[in-house]
């Protein structure tokens, strides 16, 4: 099912508001409650926060590449070569404070929105993308922003589900 087309202003607003929505989902949680999850093999709230921030940081590079070099080829093959759980373990998602990740997420989103607001045509700029499996495609800045908004929304819902399951 295709996403309804939203105005550039609405998309940028939703993208910019992501960190505040994530912070709202975390409001009132103690440090130990950040370690709650839906099960033994499920990510904790803490791990989800780090995952969101790191994913956003990775895709920020795609946006900047599209703005500066539409003939370039963007790939995250180095990242896609390993399962996400290996990155989570290697980057200590389970034990690190979430503060630096929340700060990074907010700064990255603010930086990208500021870049995009200075040129009305930026959302349609694109770059070649080599996905992990399959053929090269062209991806627009709009598509990356939409993907990041969906990613944030999905994981914010995951956090709400964890909170509900544990009554916090």
Predicted feature descriptions by range:
Residues 3-6, 45, 85-101, 134-142:
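Acidic/His metal-coordination segments adjacent to aromatic residues that form catalytic metal sites
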Residues 1-17:
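Extreme N-terminal tail/first-helix region
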Residues 9-13, 60, 64, 102:
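Generic detector of well-ordered alpha-helical segments enriched in charged/polar residues
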Residues 19-30, 57-64, 106-120, 153-156, ...:
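Structural signal for well-ordered, non-membrane alpha-helices
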Residues 12, 16-19, 42, 49, ...:
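Generic structural concept
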Residues 14, 18, 84-125:
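Acidic/histidine-rich alpha-helical segments that form the ligand environment
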Residues 35-85, 127-168:
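Short, contiguous alpha-helical
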Residues 17, 21-47:
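Long, hydrophobic N-terminal alpha-helical segment
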